[in-house]
Amino acid sequence: QMCIRDSKKGYQFSSANSINIGRLVPQIVYYVYAYAKLLANGEIKDGEKINVVVPTGNFGNILAAFYAKNMGLPINKFICASNENKVLYDFFTTGEYDRNREFVLTTSPSMDILISSNLERLIYRIAGNNAAKNAELMASLKSEGKYKITEEMKAQLADFYGNYATEAEDAATIKKIYEDCGYVIDTHTSVAATVYDKYRKETGDTTKTVIASTASPYKFTRSVMNAIDSKYDSMGDFELVDELSKISNVKVPNAIEEIRTAPVLHDTVCDSDKMCDEVKKILGI
């Protein structure tokens, strides 16, 4: 980020990850589309509320659902699903956000996050759009690695439910859904499915629910296939891709298929403290 901020050389950089509002705005459409499909299929009545379950680390996709509700979409509950990096679960449970903890490498790496960037946008809303209060909390996060919201702010999170899935639970859910339904889900969607199961058992809520499946199993083939059966452990990467296609009856995506014969274009490796120098070298500045 420090490198991105260096504009003295005439270059302007932008981030394309989920902190960019350009990612959040199209994601709002997911939930409107899902609601429209439920209506079209006769699953719900017009105006009937639904729940949404989102596997998240950076709080982007679920924030898009929150914005969709603010635009009028009938959503009852936002179910926030975390992996073992459960900083969001702890936040919704206690009202304290604390990143001072061990970072866990999991099989759902897109959720391996301890600083959930988009949560700041939700904090701003529950602080009554108070920019000064928001800045105060974010300053505490930067200096102390944590902050705590007020009871009044916490009361505004009643529509949110947080829980998490362990690595073992994640793998077990992938296996169970495949065996029960013949459907293969990825490691992130499995976190969501696991947490939804916990939510149902805790609350008994039978509201029609949409689980956001945020990734393809082809992105995490080894973790997915190993969860289904240990016999796949010894297979090579592309053998696993072919096996996944067979058991899921889903064609290998072109982007994956092309990798088999594609030349390696980028082979630069550097230490994190050398990243800025490497970017400058590539740009010739």
Language-model regions, residue ranges each:
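Short, small-residue-biased leader/transition segments that mark boundaries at the very start
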Residues: 2-4
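Active-site-adjacent helical/loop segments in soluble small-molecule enzymes
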Residues: 8-42, 46-49, 125-203, 262-268
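Electropositive phosphate-/nucleotide-binding environments in soluble metabolic enzymes
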Residues: 21-29, 59, 112-116, 120, ...
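Glycine-rich phosphate/pyrophosphate-binding loop at beta-loop-alpha junctions
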Residues: 43-46, 51-140, 212-228
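Catalytic phosphate/nucleotide-handling subdomain of diverse soluble enzymes
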Residues: 73-92, 194-261
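Exposed alpha-helical structural elements
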Residues: 87, 121, 132-137, 169, ...
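Non-catalytic terminal extensions of PLP-dependent enzymes
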Residues: 145-149, 234-285
